[in-house]
Amino acid sequence: DMGRQAARYRERRALPAGDAAHVHAPTGGQGLNIGVQDAVNLGWKLAQVVRGTSPSTLLDTYQAERHPIAARVLKLTMAQVALMRGDERTMALRENVQELLAMDQPRKRYGAMMSGLDIRYDFGEGHALLGRRMPDLDVVTADGPRRVSTLLQEARPVFLNLGEPSRFDIGAWTDRV
């Protein structure tokens, strides 16, 4: 297995992403997914720093958020490669894994791991959804219904009030959100 990962995701002005930050076996086709996720995570941060609306220390969060995700993918692909071996012990293990994947919950969990839909950034204590991926839902805006993904195309943070209308005063943030 040739899997490896950069120790640091930021060295002054160098910010590796995708295969420059981590390489692993192509098993499961996760390389493209994780590379795109790196780019999305880093892209909006770079835009904020270049525009001067966020300090350059924002780029330090790239390491904290993406490095653990890539380390997990490397372990997952290492396990997948190991399960391809043809020896008797691996074949026994593979049969046990197949039995587990015949069950609903293990199959859903593994599917989420393989697709990257289970990614959660660890921001500490708070709401259970903090750091989780937002589904691309239809939301109602002042301009009418829109998909969440269309709100993210301007490289600006998006504040979604999922509670009562006009409950939050974001006046101090209007130039950033």
Protein language model regions, located:
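FAD/FMN-dependent oxidoreductases across multiple families
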Residues: 1-30, 34, 76, 115, ...
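Catalytic cores of eukaryotic secretory-pathway lumenal/extracellular enzymes that build
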Residues: 24-33, 40, 59, 69-73
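Hydrophobic alpha-helical membrane-insertion segments
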Residues: 28, 44-47
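Short, solvent-exposed loop/helix junctions and linker helices
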Residues: 33-36, 87
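Short amphipathic alpha-helical face segments that pack within enzyme cores
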Residues: 37-45
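Helical substrate-recognition/capping region of FAD-dependent monooxygenase/halogenase enzymes
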Residues: 48-177
